[in-house]
A protein has these predicted regions:
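Glycine-rich beta-solenoid repeat tracts in large extracellular/virion proteins
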Residues: 1-6, 23-29, 43-53, 65-75
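A short, Gly/Thr-enriched small/hydrophobic beta-strand-prone motif that recurs across taxa
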Residues: 75-86
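Short, ordered, surface-exposed loop/turn motifs in non-cytosolic proteins
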Residues: 89-112
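Short, acidic Ser/Thr/Gly-rich low-complexity loop/linker segments typical of extracellular
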Residues: 104-133
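A short, solvent-exposed beta-strand micro-motif common in secreted/extracellular proteins
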Residues: 127, 131-159
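Conserved small/polar residues in nucleotide/adenosyl-binding loops
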Residues: 163-165
Length: 165
């Protein structure tokens, strides 16, 4: 599948692309494209090739084993952030203040942390949302974007750093 500069702002969704003689998907001078829930495998050159000033492209739920990103392009991998707060006995904790930072970007904050997002519900959860967790920025080696979560209940605050696997 070849996506070029004419094809900006595209959504490529629910495809299985494998066993090709060349590439699975190529983004060539293509910007603001979303790859949703695709499976790319066993393509001879690369499963995914991002090239020639392709920027602001995102992949969500897309699996691949090989990628090429040239020195003028980028791809950000996003994932769903799911939070479940429980006490030491495993019971759900409702009404807990939450703050989620994606590197230096505030993604979620309830009132204690100066935001307007809801505290945890009766299940100890907040609404699921997307976060950026890996970027291929002008290279084929991924850089992990740190996610930090702060949790506050009455008289304690805990800060957690998440490692994406």
């Amino acid at each position: 599948m070849y996506i070029d500069s004419v094809d900006n702002d595209c959504k490529v969704e629910d495809n299985t692309i494998g066993n090709n003689d060349e590439y699975g998907i190529v983004l060539h001078s293509a910007n603001y494209n979303y790859l949703w829930n695709n499976t790319l495998y066993s393509n001879d050159l690369k499963d995914l090739q991002i090239e020639t000033q392709s920027s602001s492209n995102f992949a969500i739920g897309t699996t691949f084993s090989s990628i090429g990103v040239d020195g003028s392009s980028d791809l950000t991998i996003r994932e769903y952030f799911v939070l479940d707060v429980n006490d030491a006995s495993g019971n759900n904790m409702s009404g807990i203040d939450i703050k989620v930072m994606e590197d230096d970007t505030l993604k979620y904050a309830s009132s204690y942390f100066g935001g307007g997002d809801p505290k945890t519900d009766s299940y100890g959860t907040v609404e699921t949302f997307l976060i950026d967790y890996v970027i291929y920025d002008r290279e084929s080696t991924p850089t992990t974007i740190p996610t930090n979560v702060s949790v506050r209940s009455h008289d304690w605050v805990e800060i957690l750093s998440l490692i994406h696997i």
